[in-house]
């Protein structure tokens, strides 16, 4: 397992958790079918990004720059600036979510944990190698399984859950359609495209024959290229399946607890974790908070966010696994 698993886990960021929690709290299981709808779409899109990197040895951002003419490049430049700004705001929100999650676990003040998380992330990105960062991501993806445990603990009517999962239910009203768009938007996020492509390139650089320029499949032996293609396809499939299982679990958990007790307005993932306590117990609430902290601290956008800003902008010139002296543009971004 590699980029696919990490990318899938990074999709379940605090904003995504809050959106799924709101979907479950406001409409119960009515939006659960979106987990089934988005699953093949995520697999297809992320596999395209992954295959592009494998076939060309080039990142998605660099390919876009090469593909478009001068006018297109200008538009792309504006979009990349907007991406960096959006990611900076997302980093701030994610770090605040770290504090909220740890505070719910009675681990200390939220502002202190936000500072600690920011410091650790910065240190790891500056000092650590990409191999160490990727290993931490893969190892700590398991913390997101907390949401699956919560869903199992609070759900009693699995027949109803399965029915809502496979049979779409659509309400033609403004709030439902707005939440539907929010769920689809937070599940299939554009930064995942860059993350998948760039993570694959970094992994290719770590290979013995990789070096500073990743070797595309066309320059490798047919047998090796075929094995790598099969492995990457499985990696993406497992990663996107894992991501949607977490989405499924969050919607089910909040539907079975908050919605059934007429709590329908959830503004943040931390609020959802706190609201679960009276109905699901302290253990389930703590697991939900643990999942929130994991979504921020480990395999989610709060760590990749600085990198995911850098990769589209500097993918042709730098990489996390390069020597520190060779990648000042990355650190600047």
Where are these regions (language model features)?
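Juxtamembrane transmembrane-helix boundary signature
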Residues: 6-7, 34-67, 79-85, 89
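Extracellular/periplasmic helix-exit of transmembrane alpha-helices
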Residues: 41-55, 198-206, 221-223, 241-271
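Hydrophobic transmembrane alpha-helices that form the core helical bundles
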Residues: 55, 74-107, 114, 118, ...
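Transmembrane alpha-helical segments of multi-pass small-molecule transport proteins
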Residues: 77-80, 105-127, 143-147, 152, ...
């Amino acid at each position: 397992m590699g980029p696919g698993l990490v990318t899938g886990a990074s999709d379940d960021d605090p904003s995504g958790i809050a959106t799924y929690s709101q979907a479950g709290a406001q409409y119960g299981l009515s939006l659960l079918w979106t987990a089934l709808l988005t699953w093949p779409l995520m697999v297809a899109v992320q596999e395209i990004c992954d295959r592009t990197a494998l076939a060309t040895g080039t990142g998605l951002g660099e390919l876009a720059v090469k593909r478009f003419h001068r006018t297109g490049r200008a538009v792309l430049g504006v979009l990349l600036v907007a991406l960096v700004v959006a990611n900076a705001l997302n980093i701030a929100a994610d770090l605040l979510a770290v504090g909220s999650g740890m505070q719910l676990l009675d681990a200390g003040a939220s502002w202190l944990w936000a500072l600690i998380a920011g410091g650790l992330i910065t240190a790891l990105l500056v000092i650590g190698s990409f191999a160490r960062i990727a290993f931490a991501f893969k190892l700590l993806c398991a913390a997101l399984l907390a949401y699956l445990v919560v869903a199992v603990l609070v759900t009693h009517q699995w027949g109803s859950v399965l029915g809502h999962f496979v049979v779409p239910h659509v309400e033609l009203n403004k709030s439902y359609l707005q939440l539907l768009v929010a769920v689809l938007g937070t599940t299939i996020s554009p930064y995942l495209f860059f993350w998948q492509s760039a993570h694959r390139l970094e992994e290719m650089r770590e290979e013995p024959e990789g070096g500073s320029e990743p070797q595309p499949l066309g320059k490798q032996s047919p047998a090796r290229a075929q094995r790598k293609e099969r492995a990457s396809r499985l990696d993406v499939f497992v990663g996107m399946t894992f991501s949607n299982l977490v989405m499924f679990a969050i919607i089910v958990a909040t539907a079975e607890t908050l919605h059934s007790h007429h709590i329908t307005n959830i503004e943040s993932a931390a609020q959802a974790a706190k609201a679960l306590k009276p109905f699901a117990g302290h253990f389930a609430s703590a697991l939900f908070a643990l999942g929130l902290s994991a979504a921020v601290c480990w395999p989610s956008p709060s760590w990749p966010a600085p990198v995911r800003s850098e990769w589209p902008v500097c993918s042709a010139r730098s990489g996390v696994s390069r020597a520190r002296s060779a990648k000042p543009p990355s650190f600047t971004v």
